[in-house]
Amino acid sequence: MIKLSKKYCLGISFVLYILLSVCEGHKNLTCDFNDVYKLEFHPNQQTSVTKLCNLTPNVLEKVTIKCGSDKLNYNLYPPTCFEEVYASRNMMHLKKIKEFVIGSSMFMRRSLTPNKINEVSFRIPPNMMPEKPIYCFCENKKTITINGSNGNPSSKKDIINRGIVEIIIPSLNEKVKGCDFTTSESTIFSKGYSINEISNKSSNNQQDIVCTVKAHANDLIGFKCPSNYSVEPHDCFVSAFNLSGKNENLENKLKLTNIIMDHYNNTFYSRLPSLISDNWKFFCVCSKDNEKKLVFTVEASISSSNTKLASRDNTYQDYISNSSFLTLSSYCAFITFIITSFLSFIL
């Protein structure tokens, strides 16, 4: 029997544990049909091929599709992917994303060739309905010649290498802690206000409309302004007003994550950090000339031990549901580390 030294056993187990732990922390949310799920045709290929890329992101995470380049003449379907999506794998039931998944925002596109989109990205919106899949497709099409047999003439045939993008939109257990200033009953935010109703009822009252939410560690927060209002500060959640009315950089206080600033839809989202060291209040404003200001105020409470444990549990559950293979691998690596460490002392 080969006897391994303590240092060798410890070294191998430690490296394995670190490598798999690092892998667990990396979650790939890209369907890359250029370099990963390749759609190139093989020599003598005579049949179509389909490849599936399945993504299971968390809310507010970004998903990306890479489909074609200046050298790869692929086509993305629908051409307006993420503005429109299919509701099934058979390229049927085309839906507008804002109607199919309420609260959708933040589409990003990149084009390497004229009049053709090669890369699209999309932030997963808060979804209060049961989880649902959405689909886009990347295709590489080729016409081949089929040689005739028994005296029959040759014929032409189209074959398609198709990449299917399946994205599972997760479901939230509770509404986003926030304010929707466009409707009295918001489907996404915990509080809703109809600016028209408020204006009619309080036409003589010039006081601003203040909506306050109390939030804790790891909570989703956000707000929506009417389309004809502007947002102050422009980079809300990167910075915000403190109670003195001074614009302050939130990075120095809270370090919010998953920030979405969608000025096109006037919708802003973010997530509080898992640890809040001090109570903190800040606000952002929806403003319009000669109109009441619509004030979104957040009261972020200091983390208690229970809150910190709860946020850890939530993070743990997210990893289980979205990276189960890697999580299992890290457990195996950890067990390997313990066993190998023990053996190194008895060998």
UniProtKB/Swiss-Prot annotation:
The keyword Disulfide bond applies. Residues 27-172, 175-305 form the 6-Cys domain. Disruption phenotype: No visible phenotype. Parasites grow at normal rates in vitro. The keyword Cell membrane applies. A lipid is attached at residue 322 (GPI-anchor amidated asparagine). Residues 323-347 form a propeptide. PROSITE patterns: 6_CYS. Disulfide bonds join 31-53, 67-138, 81-136, 179-211, 225-286, 236-284. Gene3D superfamilies: 2.60.40.2860. Processed into a soluble form. Residues 1-25 form the signal peptide. Glycans are attached at residues 28, 147, 200, 228, 242, 265, 322. GO terms for biological process: symbiont entry into host. It comes from the Eukaryota. Heterodimer; heterodimerizes with PF41. May form an antiparallel heterodimer with PF41. Does not have erythrocyte-receptor-binding ability. This is Merozoite surface protein P12. It comes from Plasmodium falciparum (isolate 3D7). The lineage of its organism: Eukaryota, Sar, Alveolata, Apicomplexa, Aconoidasida.
